[in-house]
Amino acid sequence: MDYSFDTTAEDPWVRISDCIKNLFSPIMSENPGHMPLQPNASLSEEDGTQGHPDGNPPKLDTANGTPKVYKSADRSTVKKGPPVAPKPAWFRQSLKGLRNRASDPRGLPDPALSTQPAPASREHLGPHIRASSSSSIKQRISSFETFGSSQLPDKGAQRLSLQPSSGEAAKPLGKHEGGRFSGLLGRGAAPTLVPQQPEQVLPSGSPAATEARDPGVSESPPPGLQPNQKTLPTGSDPLLRLLPTQTEKSQGPVLKMPSQRARSFPLTRSQSCETKLLDEKTSKLYSISSQVSSAVMKSLLCLPSSLSCAQTPCIPKEGASPTSSSNEDSAANGSAETSASDTGFSLNLSELREYTEGLTEAKEDDDGDHSSHQSGQSVISLLSSEELKQLIEEVKVLDEATLKQLDSIHVTILHKEEGAGLGFSLAGGADLENKVITVHKVFPNGLASQEGTIQKGNEVLSINGKSLKGTTHNDALAILRQAREPRQAVIVTRKLTAESMPDLNSTTDSAASASAASDVSVESSAEATVYTVTLEKMSAGLGFSLEGGKGSLHGDKPLTINRIFKGAASEQSETIQPGDEILQLAGTAMQGLTRFEAWNIIKALPDGPVTTVIRRKSLQPKETTAAADS
């Protein structure tokens, strides 16, 4: 080979070409595996022009017989030209020299100057360089400019072709590509790349595939391990196919859950949640009512809506009218159930004593209310045998006094639409003066009014299995609002009778509450006496405070004197006492007025003597009371 043009090594133009080659060397030396990927002649030839410094610097100057390594070290002392753009004349000579050097090292085996990856790349590049020797410089430059763009599809094709060959390497690659594939679907990637990746993504690592395995889709991974060629033509269809199968399989357990839960509802679960607190704060009466309420509510929620609604018309039979009985609630229940059979029904807790485990047969044959028996059987049929056994055992061990109180407790079940109210409002709470939560008002066209069991002034023990004992007013209202959502509502109420609470006309302060038994006995045996007294109206008022009135927290009650202010004229004269009912004030009747209206009347009175008519209960049978008024 003629190396005459290399003998003039001191020519600055030749040295500039070496600098240019060294400038390209960092780019080409990083990826030595890119050379065999180029099949075209022009591209491989440009690899020859720039590939010599790619990991093989010693072979660049083998024509001079000295390694490039040592010459590059002395390059700092050699005179260099300015870094100007190359001209076609010397650039053509440099290309010819590079072709000669590329073909020559095959016949010059120098172990000190050659490395292992270099001969393999040279063998591939040699034929291509000779085939493209007749190409022009402009074609070479254009091929070099398109080097980066022409390499990407070839390299991507080679990587895709190598993935099916290695099984272990394809799995992590599929997981990595799965995230990229899911992102490409959301961004609207090109359709040419989408069908190539789902076959590796969906079975192994995509989020849709992992979610499909969680509930009960253990059958989905084996088909995902089949060859990828079967899933290749489907494109993005596997995503659409996995979603309906996932929803269908996830809906399977949901449809089965009601039947499983309806068969097994241990009453101990409700005891562990509610009766532990009830045993500490309340009596067995509240615990039994809460158990019945929670058990009935859970059973109603487990039943399909069609079955739970279909039970209601079957409760009363042939419009049976109730007969007279000792309990007023049973008569009210019978008439309400016959008139409003589609709104709900109720059960008296005392009827638990009359039922056996057969759920429909009574222990004793009563000639009483048939419709109440039908409603009782309907409620009992909602309970499981285990729950009913335990309830019957708990009722049997109760004493007679507690059993009498069970007569006043009713479990009312209302059927309604979703979002509809129950038809009554609440009053009282642990944070108010009236600690007991009662029914404040029953709306005329509401569900409670149509059913007929829930009356104004009844104590509300629980709503939908949630006990209201000891709750604040806001918490009770929140429980009442939550009852709007389900189609059924279970309300446990107790009618406040003379035996269960103080007289409605008595005061509810601490002293009167402590003497509840005495107030009851006084009311039953003594007669109220009407007095006419004269009070002194001053700038501060009449010297006492009022309670009760229409629409109060305790319901519609008469206006009574709550307490007498110290230093007032009425205190010194002792003409009035706390608990006295005000009938008339300065010729104005006070019956049926709210407390606010009564105060407006008092404020409008002129200063001076005011004639007042009061009614006071006589305290003659004081000896028969258990405790005396203070």
UniProtKB/Swiss-Prot annotation:
Keywords: Chemotaxis, Cytokine, Cytoplasm, Nucleus, Phosphoprotein, Repeat, Secreted, Transcription, Transcription regulation. Residues 30-268, 316-343 are annotated as: Disordered. The keyword Cytoplasm applies. Residues 410-495, 532-617 form the PDZ domain. Residues 404-500 are annotated as: Interaction with PPP1R12A, PPP1R12B and PPP1R12C. Homotetramer. Pro-interleukin-16 interacts (via PDZ 2 domain) with PPP1R12A, PPP1R12B and PPP1R12C. Pro-interleukin-16 interacts with GRIN2A. Pro-interleukin-16 interacts with GABPB1. Pro-interleukin-16 interacts (via PDZ 3 domain) with HDAC3. Interleukin-16 stimulates a migratory response in CD4+ lymphocytes, monocytes, and eosinophils. Primes CD4+ T-cells for IL-2 and IL-15 responsiveness. Also induces T-lymphocyte expression of interleukin 2 receptor. Ligand for CD4. Pro-interleukin-16 is involved in cell cycle progression in T-cells. Appears to be involved in transcriptional regulation of SKP2 and is probably part of a transcriptional repression complex on the core promoter of the SKP2 gene. May act as a scaffold for GABPB1 (the DNA-binding subunit the GABP transcription factor complex) and HDAC3 thus maintaining transcriptional repression and blocking cell cycle progression in resting T-cells. This is Pro-interleukin-16. It comes from Macaca fascicularis.
